[in-house]
């Protein structure tokens, strides 16, 4: 989990929607599997990989270094776009960044099937 801050409270929904368009793509079938979610817990906000969410639910999951790199890369990109700020001190634990995921533009969203790998609240 990467602790973040939002520029404005209403940015929560922007980040949540943007994350639905970031993940692993099957270009042939036009399916995108969402990698990360935004989590609010006790007044704090986090970018969380779906496997971390499953682990918090008590499920046995193996989170790979590739999963961590993807989560970190997504958080950095959201920060570059001005949607979030990564809390100071979090960067020291972040992995080397790579572009190992796909971002579907808002305009292309209707052309793709967007599939969350975790549903918050279920």
Curated annotation (Swiss-Prot):
One of its GO terms (molecular function) is RNA binding. This is Translation repressor protein. Keywords: Repressor, RNA-binding, Translation regulation. The keyword Repressor applies. It holds the Pfam family Translat_reg. InterPro entries: Transl_repress_RegA, Transl_repress_RegA_sf. Transmembrane segments: none annotated. GO terms for biological process: regulation of translation. It comes from the Viruses. Residues 15-37 bind DNA. Controls the translation of a number of proteins (such as regA itself, rIIB and at least 35 others) by binding to their mRNA.
């Amino acid at each position: 989990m990467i602790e973040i801050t939002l520029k404005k409270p209403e940015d929560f929904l922007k980040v949540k929607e943007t994350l639905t368009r970031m993940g692993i793509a099957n270009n042939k079938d036009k399916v995108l599997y969402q990698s990360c979610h935004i989590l609010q817990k006790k007044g704090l906000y986090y970018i969380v990989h779906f496997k971390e969410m499953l682990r918090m639910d008590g499920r046995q999951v193996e989170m790979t270094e590739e999963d961590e790199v993807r989560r970190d890369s997504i958080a950095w990109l959201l920060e570059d776009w001005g949607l979030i700020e990564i809390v100071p001190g979090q960067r020291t634990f972040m992995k080397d960044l790579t572009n190992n995921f796909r971002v579907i533009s808002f305009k292309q969203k209707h052309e793709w099937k967007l599939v969350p790998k975790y549903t918050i609240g279920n």
